[in-house]
Amino acid sequence: MIPGEVITPETDIELNVGRETLKVVVANLGDRPIQVGSHFHFYEANDALQFDREVAKGFRLNIAAGTAIRFEPGQSREVELVALAGKREVYGFAGRVMGRLYENVD
């Protein structure tokens, strides 16, 4: 093995298998393009983007890591979102959550 070498399997690597997904229609009502990255908590995206935010809470774009989707002014399109994993705690972004997404219900 060469230092830094990455050895991958011969088969395709599937991402987000078994994770909850949903589709939402998003419209850019602003006058500037808006770009949203792959791991941005979609619920907290730019306010000029119109979509059902409550449905998107706890989800991010279902696209490859390090990529983004650009919404042009006046554009409307359907995007697929995937549920956040791990502890399901969100900090930063627009500061609208700053903690657990949902309290555990027993």
Swiss-Prot record:
It catalyses: urea + 2 H2O + H(+) = hydrogencarbonate + 2 NH4(+). One of its GO terms (biological process) is urea catabolic process. One of its GO terms (cellular component) is urease complex. Gene3D superfamilies: Urease, beta subunit. It is found in: Cytoplasm. GO terms for molecular function: urease activity. Pathway: Nitrogen metabolism; urea degradation; CO(2) and NH(3) from urea (urease route): step 1/1. InterPro entries: Urease_beta-like, Urease_betasu_sf, Urease_subunit. The keyword Cytoplasm applies. HAMAP family: Urease_beta. Belongs to the urease beta subunit family. Heterotrimer of UreA (gamma), UreB (beta) and UreC (alpha) subunits. Three heterotrimers associate to form the active enzyme. This is Urease subunit beta. It comes from Acinetobacter baumannii (strain SDF). The gene is ureB.
